[in-house]
Amino acid sequence: MNIKNQDQDLLQIKMNIVRSKVSFKRLKDKELSQWQKIPTSIAGDSMNRQNVMSSRISSIREGMTLCGQARTVSVTHGDNSAIHAALTIINKGEILVVEGGGFTDRAVWGELMSLSSIHIGLGGVVIDGAIRDLGDLKKMNLPLFASGRTAAGPTKGGGGRIDIPISCGNVSLKPGDIIIGDDDGVAVIPFEIQNQILLSSEEKIIYEKEIIKKIKDGNTHKDIFDIKDIPIVNDDNLSLIHI
């Protein structure tokens, strides 16, 4: 049996893949475009420094950005059967988010899946697991964020679940939540508080622009942030200094 036929046979194994019924409001392009202007760092600050994925998940090259609503997949260790299945139902512009447990000893994503995703019009992919074919993936116009890379391929037939609440990069999310990503990482905005977080993020951007202007105008760090004089204490009488 050659490798190609072996792979096809593995995919034909009856897999225990479960898809949950999901219903969420699809945001219009105009609504999503507002989030394209929000950096992940600002969104995270607006959520009390929460809902930003672990730094182990990063883009495969600089300049990649994500903005779209999540479709979720949970896979078993090193198995990508459920991802293959998800690619048959996901819609244009959506972000595929994969709960892979952070395992990086087997790649669950590679060149072929990326090519299919581009054909679908996927908005991007976030994987808490490993990828491979990195050289080819970097040349593609598909935003891809992952927690590792390896030449070792995936297993098949291990099953998985689609369109369920998952944890990716230590952040809980569900289908329909807004996913944004950039060079700093990936942030998750729960759908039900998106308007509140968007407003807060826009206000923070304005605030930071004002701070930048003050710095460029020559104002000192002390004056800008109203930092009090730091008391000098003897080494034998050290105490906690409150700024």
Model-assigned labels for residue ranges:
Residues 2-76, 207-221, 226-230:
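Intrinsically disordered, low-complexity regions enriched in acidic/Ser/Thr/Pro/Gln residues
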Residues 55-58, 75, 97-99, 125-129, ...:
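General beta-strand structural signal in soluble alpha/beta enzymes
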Residues 57-60, 80-87:
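Short, charged beta->alpha transition segments
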Residues 86-129:
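Extracellular/luminal Protease-associated
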Residues 132-149:
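Histidine/lysine/aspartate-rich catalytic loop segments that bind and position anionic ligands
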Residues 147-224:
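Acidic, glycine-rich flexible loop/linker segments
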Residues 241-243:
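Conserved small/polar residues in nucleotide/adenosyl-binding loops
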